[in-house]
A protein has these predicted regions:
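A short, structured active-site edge motif that brings together acidic residues
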Residues: 28-41, 74-75
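N-terminal binding-site loop/beta-alpha segment at the start of enzyme catalytic domains
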Residues: 1-33
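Short amphipathic alpha-helices and their capping/turn segments at secondary-structure boundaries
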Residues: 15-25, 56-64, 137-145
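CE4/NodB-like, metal-dependent polysaccharide N-deacetylase domain
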Residues: 52-75, 95-99
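Beta/alpha (TIM)-barrel catalytic core signal, keyed to glycine-rich beta->alpha loops juxtaposed to Asp/Glu
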Residues: 21, 76-210
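Active-site mouth loops of central-metabolism enzymes
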Residues: 38-54, 80-82, 161-167
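Glycine-centered flexible beta-alpha turn that most often forms the glycine-rich phosphate-binding loop
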Residues: 5, 69, 105
Length: 210
């Protein structure tokens, strides 16, 4: 089933909308948010400083109307190793975890080396892995071997999975993802309720072996 919601300050008013919707059912959901990226006036701006990291998490807590966020990921600008090695963002997230404001932290990155270092120093990595792109598989393998978390982004190749005629791209995608022991969950985005219902049914069939 679905029990994880992926959001971020850079996703418009997503957090503000989720706050009221979670009222009365907060315990049923795992919330994932981000730090590092702000989307303002149609452009992304990145800030991985300690001050902005703490500000961003505190703001997300208020917007989501909650006292903790299960997982906060660093929204990488593509320079994964530089972010992890030369900014204060990971150390600040570790402190926020000690304070109980977040329960886990990691990186939504773009490179294998970044994903591996993110797992070595943190709890989770969000990686691209689908029928078309599997370059980050070493990160999944590391997570499986070391008990770390993996969330998959672009799980359905943004809807453009290319297969042979007659193949169900959604089912084939889920079989690939959930066939790997390192995968904790997949982020599936849609604005179509029918697509959502169909995707959930397909994922359930794959997970139960039907």
């Amino acid at each position: 089933g679905i029990n994880l919601i992926d959001t971020a300050p850079a996703y418009g008013v997503s957090e503000e909308r989720l706050g009221p919707l979670l009222a009365g059912q907060r315990e049923d959901w795992v919330i994932v948010s981000k730090v590092g990226e702000e989307f303002e006036n149609g452009q992304s701006r990145f800030d991985f400083s300690a001050a902005h990291t703490r500000f961003s998490v505190e703001r997300s807590l208020k917007r989501l109307r909650t006292d903790r966020i299960e997982l906060v990921l660093v929204h990488s600008d593509g320079n994964d190793l530089d972010i992890l090695q030369h900014t204060e963002v990971y150390q600040t997230l570790a402190q926020l975890k000690r304070e109980g404001k977040i329960l886990a932290f990691g990186l939504s990155g773009k490179t294998v080396d970044g994903g591996l270092l993110a797992l070595q120093q943190g709890d989770c990595a969000m990686v691209t892995y689908n029928l078309n792109e599997q370059a980050e598989r070493p990160v999944l393998d590391y997570a499986a071997a070391h008990g770390k978390g993996i969330l998959i982004k672009k799980a359905l190749a943004s809807g453009h999975a290319c297969l042979k005629p007659g193949d169900d791209p959604v089912r084939r995608s889920f079989e690939l993802l959930f066939g790997h022991p390192g995968v904790s969950g997949a982020i599936i985005g849609t604005i179509n309720p029918q697509h959502l219902t169909s995707n959930v049914a397909t994922a359930a069939a794959v997970l139960t072996g039907d």
